[in-house]
Amino acid sequence: MSIVQLDHVSVTFKRKKAADVQAVQDVTLHIEKGDIYGIVGFSGAGKSTLVRTINLLQKPTAGDVVVGGVDFVKDGKQVISGKDLQARRRKIGMIFQQFNLLNETTVIENIAFALKHSDLSDDELEEKCHKLLKLVDLEDKANAYPAQLSGGQQQRVAIARALANDPEILLSDEATSALDPQTTIQILDLLKKLNRELGLTIVLITHEMAAVKKIANKVAVMENGRVVENGNLRDVFLAPKAELTQKFVGGSLAVVDTLKSLNISLAENEALYQLVYSLNNVAKSIIIELYREVGVEASMLYGNVEVLADEPVGTLLVMVKGDADKQKATLKFLSDEGVTVTELDERGNRL
């Protein structure tokens, strides 16, 4: 079941002395409960504007927004009351590139600030804050001030604060962009842990495909306010259709570059296939087994292994020699082995 439904959402910024800016254009995304949904694109693509329509920090000018089964926006008009929206927002945590901590208060006081409207007693409040600090591995920093913390530690405090009201959804807007690579990995690992242990749905806004590749299970690629491609991470990453997605991913371009450098000309009995398969499920050599079982010669032209959300996935580009019956048998064998096959022409285009 979708916990977030964005249907035909658009955001247009009106300007008096210049043309209107269409920041988001006719975007439809359905995010399931428990997803880590990556939204990736270059600066100015509309990612941050789009994610803010989920909690109505940015009101759409068109389309529908439904969160947790509750209508927020219908046909570009807010239909949820201000009071109800305030209550629902407490179930949607959000973290940013800037940590937005209160510098004059301690770590534990920063977290407690998010609970100032709760009904918790002082003892219950302190207990909850310490529990949140433990969750983000900062138990020993309760009485420290933000200036005494590293960037990664400050982001952990921001995450703990965002979790204070037990949200169902966490919106992460470029939360790792200001961090070094090692700290970025640590924060992404923490988000993955929260998703796993709390069942937290996470919407991950980033311009870094590596971040999406590491923890997301689904991805949408944005350009000029539009979603140009979206789907399961494995499908989008390993068989990108849009040109922008290919630029982000790189793997598809590597196949094209390989074919360009080899300058292949296929004979009538030859075919090019891109093979994609999980190394967890297919441990044996596909090329050797193909020869043994089908009796065709397969030449490997390109090979690569990517780790997608902790799953090692292999990509091979092979040229198979054989008549029509052999090619048909090849496709059946590979399909039976759990291999995703895409036939390509000499330039790397899908057939």
From Swiss-Prot:
Gene3D superfamilies: 3.30.70.260, P-loop containing nucleotide triphosphate hydrolases. GO terms for cellular component: plasma membrane. Its EC number is 7.4.2.11. Its main location: membrane. It is an enzyme of class 7 (translocase). Keywords: Amino-acid transport, ATP-binding, Cell membrane, Membrane, Nucleotide-binding, Translocase, Transport. PROSITE patterns: ABC_TRANSPORTER_1, ABC_TRANSPORTER_2, METN. It catalyses: L-methionine(out) + ATP + H2O = L-methionine(in) + ADP + phosphate + H(+); D-methionine(out) + ATP + H2O = D-methionine(in) + ADP + phosphate + H(+). Residues 4-249 form the ABC transporter domain. It is found in: Cell membrane. It comes from the Bacteria. ATP binds at G41, F42, S43, G44, A45, G46, K47, S48. It is a peripheral membrane protein. GO terms for molecular function: ABC-type D-methionine transporter activity; ATP binding; ATP hydrolysis activity. Part of the ABC transporter complex MetNIQ involved in methionine import. Responsible for energy coupling to the transport system. Belongs to the ABC transporter superfamily. Methionine importer (TC 3.A.1.24) family. PANTHER family: AMINO ACID IMPORT ATP-BINDING PROTEIN, METHIONINE IMPORT ATP-BINDING PROTEIN METN. The complex is composed of two ATP-binding proteins (MetN), two transmembrane proteins (MetI) and a solute-binding protein (MetQ). This is Methionine import ATP-binding protein MetN. It comes from Lactobacillus delbrueckii subsp. bulgaricus (strain ATCC 11842 / DSM 20081 / BCRC 10696 / JCM 1002 / NBRC 13953 / NCIMB 11778 / NCTC 12712 / WDCM 00102 / Lb 14). The lineage of its organism: Bacteria, Bacillati, Bacillota, Bacilli, Lactobacillales. The gene is metN.
